A protein has these predicted regions:
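Conserved segment of the helicase C-terminal RecA-like domain
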Residues: 279-299
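Walker B catalytic acidic pair
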Residues: 4
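Conserved Helicase C-terminal RecA-like lobe
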Residues: 97-115, 120, 134-251
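Single conserved hydrophobic/aromatic residue that forms the stacking wall/gate
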Residues: 302-311
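A short beta-strand element within the Helicase C-terminal
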Residues: 252-263, 288
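Residues immediately C-terminal
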Residues: 7, 261, 280
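Conserved SF2 helicase motif VI
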Residues: 269-283
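Conserved P-loop NTPase motor "coupling/switch" region that bridges the ATPase
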Residues: 7, 16-93
Length: 311
């Protein structure tokens, strides 16, 4: 059995190749996020448990991935019919009907004037790249565009993520601090997720300045159990700063009753998994999840239905 089987999603990775070589009579995979990035993730996991079902990777790309991207409903239905007999899915409603309700809200944040200036400068640079080579398929050009999009996402969070000398503030950071301040004064515990470690570091600095205790979990954390225990066992540690990749799965943190998603991710399944660290079996409090979105920024695209349609 492969637990957290989405980790073999890259068919070119050593993890995938090692898993495929395992010898066994029966194979199972267990995951809460079967699709993290694209439908290729699904192919990789089915290639492990039932190699012939979805054909080769190239055939799967032509028969399903491309047609589904183009809105072919028939291809989507066919794929669902093929994999349905091999999937046993349980939902919280079925196994834990007593679980308190989950409330999800979006908090929209305005940029500060200085932050907006940095954002507009970067946006103009990206626009110039696109205008100079509107039809280019060159890999270097594509990399420049993707890097520009990433920088816009980071600037919409806080310019310090990419501009070390920036001394101004961030509208989103101010809103996060204000919201947390209210919750911690009421005795709540909060999980704060970000896909950018630097974003967590900026928040950690702000928390330290205010004398707020916090736990921090990223990919470079040496002692995960210690950080987890610090948050769960200490009543006055009311914030747990967690990178989405390092702590989005595999943690039971029902001591928290609030979850902050402080920068949006295009795949809602990854965010749902993060929220499920608190909203899970064993939780006896209502859980409220806040998504912080910067107004007039590229992050608004990450909340629209089309790029997040992984169903």
């Amino acid at each position: 059995m492969l637990d957290e089987s989405q980790n073999i999603k890259n068919s070119e990775s050593l993890t995938f190749r090692s898993a495929i070589r395992l010898q066994s009579k029966h194979r199972l995979v267990l995951t809460g996020t079967p699709i993290e990035n694209s439908l290729k993730d699904l192919w990789a996991q089915f290639h492990f448990i039932q190699p012939d079902l979805l054909g080769t990777e190239n055939a799967f790309q032509k028969q399903f991935i491309m047609p589904i991207r183009q809105g072919n409903a028939r291809a989507k239905v066919l794929l669902q019919q093929l994999i349905a007999p091999f999937i046993l899915r349980r939902s919280k409603k079925e196994v834990a009907p007593e679980l308190p309700a989950l409330t999800e809200e979006t908090i929209y944040c305005d940029m500060t004037e200085e932050q907006n200036t940095c954002y507009e400068q970067e946006k103009n640079s990206l626009r110039n790249i696109l205008l100079q080579h509107p039809q280019s398929t060159d890999r270097l050009h594509s990399f420049s565009v993707l890097n520009g999009i990433l920088r816009l996402r980071q600037l919409s969070c806080h310019p310090q993520l990419i501009l070390p000398d920036y001394t101004g503030t961030s509208g989103k950071t101010a809103q996060i601090i204000e919201t947390f301040d209210t919750l911690q004064s009421e005795g709540h515990k909060v999980l704060i997720f970000s896909s950018f470690v630097r974003h967590l570091e900026v928040l950690a600095e702000a928390f330290h300045e205010r004398g707020w205790k916090y736990a921090l979990l990223t990919g470079s954390t040496n002692n995960r159990p210690s950080e987890i225990a610090y948050f769960t066992d200490q009543k006055d540690v009311q914030a747990f700063l967690i990178s989405l990749k390092a702590g989005g799965v595999g943690l039971n943190l029902t001591q928290a009753d609030y979850v902050f998603i402080i920068d949006p991710w295009w795949n809602p399944a990854a965010e749902s998994q993060a929220i499920a660290r608190a909203h899970r079996i064993g939780q006896d409090k209502q859980v409220i999840a806040y998504r912080f979105i910067t107004q007039n920024s590229i992050c608004l695209l990450y909340t629209s239905p089309s790029p997040r349609d992984c169903s």
